[in-house]
C-alpha cells in the first residue's frame, strides 16, 4: 500500500510540474568545455586533471522575438563617433578607441589588483555625460559610496545597485536603459531557478548568456568582472571567454604600484595594445611615460643591474633586470625569480655554465624585474 501511495504521489507531481523526471545534469570540463556522461578525474579531450565538474541545465524556454530579414553588408552603416570615450586614454587605447555600444567586456585579475577601482573610476568619468549603472554583488550601496568618496568621484548620472539575483538585474537594466552597466562580479550573481550556488559552471554560463543578450537587445555596453584561479586563468568555464566581445587582464604585483591592462581578445580592435597604470591612494593614475617611471630608482653603474628593452603590445618599454648571486649554504642551490619565467631563467643559467664556463652549481641565484613588471620578451635574455 505504501509503495502504491508513493507511486501515485510521484505520478501526480510529474503531471503537475514535469520537471522532477526531466531534470538534466551533465559533467563539463572547465578547461575545454567537453561534455562527458559521468565524472572523471582526467578530461578525455584535453587531458587536464580535476577540471570536470557537475553542470545543471535550465529548463528549456521558448524565446520570443521578432524576425529580422538579412541585410546586405554594404547597406549596414555605422559611425566611429558611436564609441564611448572613458576619458582614460590608456583604457580607450586598449579597447581600440573607446567602448562600443552593445558590447560585452570581461575583465579579470588577481584579488586586490584594482579591478573594482578601475570600474568605479570608469563610472565616475562616464556619469558626467552618460547614464551608468554599477551593480555590485560583493558590496552594499553604502560601501560603494564610501569607496567612491575616497576616489573623489562626484555625483552624476551614476546609479548604484547591490544585487545578486540575475533576474532582478535584467529588470533594472531594461527599465533604466543605461549607456554602460557594470556587473561586479560574474561569480557572485545567480539564477534562483538553478539549484547550484553562485560561481558554479551553470550559474556563470547562464549569467553570461543573459548579459550577452541584454547588451545586444538594449545597446548597453556591459562590463563583467571575473575572478581568476591560482594558475592565473579566469575562473569558470572556457565558454565565458568565447561568448564575450572583449577579454581584458589586469596584471601586476599586488604590493607594487604598477598595473598592466592587457587585451587577450577584442572583436573591435587590436589585441597588441596594453595600458599602464599606477596605483595611488586616490585610485589608478595613467602612466604616459612608463620607461621613465620604471628606471627612476636605478643606480648608475650598479653591479647586478641591467636595462632591457622589451615590447609590450606595440609599446617599447625599458625595464631594470636585477640579479644577485651568492654562495649557498645548502646541498641544493636556491633559484628564485620575480617577473621572469623560472624555466627560462634555468635555461639561461645552463647556457652560462656550459658555454661561458661559470660554475654556478654551488651558488644561490635571485632574479627580479623592478616595478613588478612581468617580462616574457625573449629579447630580454
Regions found by a protein language model. Give the residues of each.
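Detector for small/aliphatic-rich hydrophobic stretches
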Residues: 18-24, 30, 35-105, 127-134
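Short hinge/gating elements
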Residues: 27-33, 76-78, 109, 191-198, ...
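Conserved P-loop NTPase
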Residues: 44-48, 52, 58-73, 77, ...
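Conserved inter-motif catalytic segment of the P-loop NTP-binding fold
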Residues: 102, 110-113, 121-122, 126-210, ...
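Walker A/P-loop
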Residues: 116
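Substrate-engagement module of ASCE P-loop NTPases
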Residues: 202-223, 227, 243-254, 353
